[in-house]
Amino acid sequence: RYLHYKTDGIYAPGGGKNMAPRQHMRKIKAGKITFSEAYKAVEEYRTKYPDKAVTYYAQNYPAMAWAVLMAGGSCPSIFVHDETFLSDVAKMKVEKTDTDTYKKLVKSDTGAIVYSQSPGEISVFVDDGKYSLKYIDPSSGTVEVLNKSFKISGLYVLKIPEGKEGVYWIHKLK
């Protein structure tokens, strides 16, 4: 229940010491938690309990909201106030990427959300149609339109430029 991943291993409060986990964290060096560790923790629980709500709470948890969302977690504290985005993300499922440089949520008839931590090219498969491409600042939730309308025929290669790592939202237009 109180286990979580850190950069140097797993945090687990000592048993039988009559201390609350927060007290135990003060006594030891708790370590740092990164996007990858938070993602891994939520993904493991989501896989083990697919029909349950999975929440995440650990050291610096508000900063890990995007990791929670991208791993399929419930109720992350992201700051995006776009109703269409929230509607789209609720329909999407996690798509395995086998890399820590980016994570994807996809529903082929709705679009995709890509969280990229480094520049490069990312392939996204969606249904044929017209889409818009938007960039979301992960810390502020500000939505910036990059391409108002373009056509996709199955495969779209998203190019992440240097210095523009973050959240990309590919939204299907009606």
Give the label of every model feature segment:
Residues R1-R26:
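Aromatic- and acid-rich polysaccharide-binding/catalytic face
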Residues M19-N147, L155, K159-K174:
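Aromatic- and carboxylate-lined catalytic core of secreted/periplasmic carbohydrate-active enzymes
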